[in-house]
From Swiss-Prot:
SUPFAM superfamilies for this protein: FAD-linked reductases, C-terminal domain, FAD/NAD(P)-binding domain
Domain of life: Eukaryota
Its EC number(s): 1.1.99.-
Signal peptide boundaries: 1-19
Phenotype of null mutants: Abolishes the production of terreic acid, but accumulates terremutin.
Glycosylation sites: N43, N69, N87, N290, N368, N418, N421, N552
Family stated for the protein in its record: Belongs to the GMC oxidoreductase family.
Protein name, per record: Glucose methanol choline oxidoreductase atC
Organism: Aspergillus terreus (strain NIH 2624 / FGSC A1156)
Enzyme class name: oxidoreductase
């Protein structure tokens, strides 16, 4: 059983299940001491300098550091989430704490960048808090832990967009497998899976099914079947055309989150000489006169210094901060750089552009069964859940409140315009338009906050056509970038959102356990009323991508090539979701891990 450090940084109800975990590594040393940390405010040099200790960054760092005589430094603006927010990231059931949606105050503040979008025209001028991990593990420490792969056709599209068949399903599958240590379920009838898409060797990332089947899962399987969706053999075989229980990045030994920090970093700290620079802001990538990246200007607690790279700088700061740092370093559209007095190193128009995201919408319902919707707010229910979690590693805290996920192209398209149909036809044939899942925590109405019988039947619109951007707010790296998701700016997305709400209502009715709809409510009927409700309540999908998009050299909007190398300079790569040429369907985590594995292998092959 993997052990976790003992840290005291807990707040409110979410501290209930905090346990005393051991704190020593395989050498008997305390992990927070030793030689794994850089000397702050002192210049130093390494073979590889990685900016951002998130999902991709720690994967690449661990793979590089595992090689003999290779020195690796990771620059991270945050620290260990076990220190900064206790066990809120570790315990799966506490993940709802990150879903602040319309609350513009980030929570917990120490592991979230607190990014706020520009007012969204398509969302009736609302601003959205965009959760993004400011911690080791990045957004893999904050997300809902759903782990599945995209469709074969979507990977084929990736390959076509960048003119490189490395990104087809067959060629990418070894990298999709490489990170994953899959644990088979005890009940294969309840949790179907395809063993051929996992590697028996496995990697450090723990992928499994939860120890606990949420009440929502039973009625959603019934509803999906009655609504015409077909059961499929898991969600990791390149098919998303039906429904199945999803796998999660949860360690089956103790039912804790398996983030890139818990998986890749903890193992690397035990076995490699990786060096961490924590609570350290990367301010600028440094270049020599030949436009070769040779270091990063950083700041820790007001002290500015340089971390030099003898071989490469690898930018893994995420979909918002990677383009921001490129722009601050002189890589981007020349006009926008000159506006801030930033010397142009490489004139790349695509930096910060082409932002993709999904759209999250929901319906809320009162049910005639217990759903565990009150488990995080009712002290008695929480105490019971904590006891089950700590003593048996089961119960509602082992999951996110729902785990059966459905996918489809909307069957009722009579209200779609010809233009919408043409737009949707441009996506790959196996690209689902909508994802469905029922979630219980957080679904109680304000009038009945402690109830335990509500559920949200939710949808994430997948085939979105609205595109946003990331821009500099100023030349000061301390200032957050300007983020505009441009949600619902494309008419096809509006048609899909209205259709998805109608379909959610059908699915909720088909559960057989619904008492009444709470939201949007029976007074919201016409397409115009539904769309207005969506504009007032929908949020982004927290799957932003493609702001440093990959492409071949003939693409004027490409920022990196197919090996993540930034055009116009040398020894600089971008390895995170920002480098994807477009957003594959579903939750992109598995694709990001695979991309990081592929690029790490490419770096080591040189």
């Amino acid at each position: 059983m993997r052990v976790f450090p003992t840290y005291i940084a807990v707040s409110g109800l979410f501290g209930g299940a905090f346990a005393a975990f051991g704190a020593t590594n395989i050498k008997g040393q305390t992990k927070l001491f030793g030689t794994s940390f850089g000397i702050l405010a002192k210049n130093a040099s390494y073979d590889y300098v990685i900016v951002g200790g998130g999902t991709a960054g720690l994967t690449v760092a661990a793979r590089l550091a595992a090689q003999p005589n290779v020195s690796v430094a990771v620059i991270e603006a945050g620290s260990f989430y076990e220190i900064d927010n206790g066990n809120i990231s570790q315990v799966p059931g506490y993940g709802a704490n990150y879903l602040s949606f319309n609350d513009l105050t980030p929570s917990p503040v120490l592991v979230d960048w607190g990014l706020i979008t520009e007012p969204q025209d398509g969302l009736n001028n609302r601003q959205i808090h965009y959760s993004a991990g400011k911690t080791l593990g990045g957004s893999s420490a904050l997300n809902d832990m759903i782990f599945h792969r995209a469709t074969k056709g979507s990977y084929q599209r990736w390959a076509e967009l960048v003119d490189d068949d490395t990104y087809t399903w067959d060629k990418l599958l070894p990298y999709l497998k490489k990170s994953v240590d899959f644990t088979k379920p005890k009940d294969a009838a309840t949790y179907p899976y395809d063993a051929s898409v996992y590697s028996p060797e496995g990697g450090p990332l723990q992928v499994s099914f939860p120890n606990y089947r949420a009440p929502c899962d039973d009625f959603m399987e019934t509803a999906f079947t009655k609504s015409g969706l077909k059961p499929i053999k898991g969600l990791n075989s390149g098919h998303l055309d039906g429904f199945a229980p999803t796998t999660f990045v949860i360690n089956p030994a103790d039912q804790t989150r398996s983030s890139s920090e818990a998986a890749f970093l903890q193992e690397a700290l035990d076995t490699t000489a990786m060096t961490l620079y924590l609570r350290t802001l990367a301010k600028k990538i440094l270049f020599d006169t030949n436009k070769t990246a040779n270091g990063v200007l950083v700041e820790t607690n007001g002290a500015e210094y340089t971390i030099s790279a003898k071989k490469e700088v690898i930018l893994s700061a995420g979909v918002f901060h990677s383009p921001q740092l490129l722009l601050l370093s002189g890589i981007g559209q020349a006009d926008s750089l000159e506006k801030f007095g930033i010397p142009v190193i490489s004139d790349l128009a695509g930096v910060g552009q082409n932002l993709w995201d999904h759209l999250f919408i929901f319906t809320s319902h009162e049910m005639n069964i217990t759903t565990n919707s009150g488990v995080l707010v009712d002290p008695e229910l929480l105490a019971e859940a904590v006891e089950s979690y700590l003593n048996q590693q089961t119960g509602p805290l082992t999951g996110i409140g729902g785990g059966v996920v459905g996918w489809e192209k909307l069957p009722n398209r009579v209200s779609f315009s010809n233009s919408t149909n043409e737009t949707l036809a441009s996506f790959p044939d196996d690209f689902p338009e909508v994802e469905y899942v029922a979630l219980a925590p957080g679904s109680n109405p304000a009038s009945d906050p402690l109830a335990n019988h509500f559920a949200s039947v939710t949808a994430a619109v997948q085939s979105t056509s609205s595109r946003g951007y990331v821009k500099l707010r100023s030349a000061d790296p301390h200032d957050a970038p300007i983020i505009n998701i441009n949600a619902l700016s494309h008419p096809a997305d509006a048609d899909l959102a209205v259709g998805a709400i109608k379909r959610l209502r059908q699915i909720a009715e088909a559960t057989g356990v619904r008492v009444k709809e709470v939201l949007p409510g029976p007074e919201v009927v016409s397409d115009a009323e539904i769309l207005e409700w969506v504009r007032n309540n929908a949020v982004n999908g927290y799957h932003a991508s493609s702001t440093c998009a990959m492409g071949n050299s003939s693409n004027p909007d490409a920022v990196v090539d197919t090996r993540a190398k930034v055009y116009g300079v040398s020894n600089l790569r971008v390895v995170d979701a920002s480098a994807l040429p477009y957003l594959p369907p579903g939750h992109p985590m598995s694709s990001i891990y695979a991309f990081a594995e592929l690029i790490a292998e490419d770096i080591l092959s040189k």
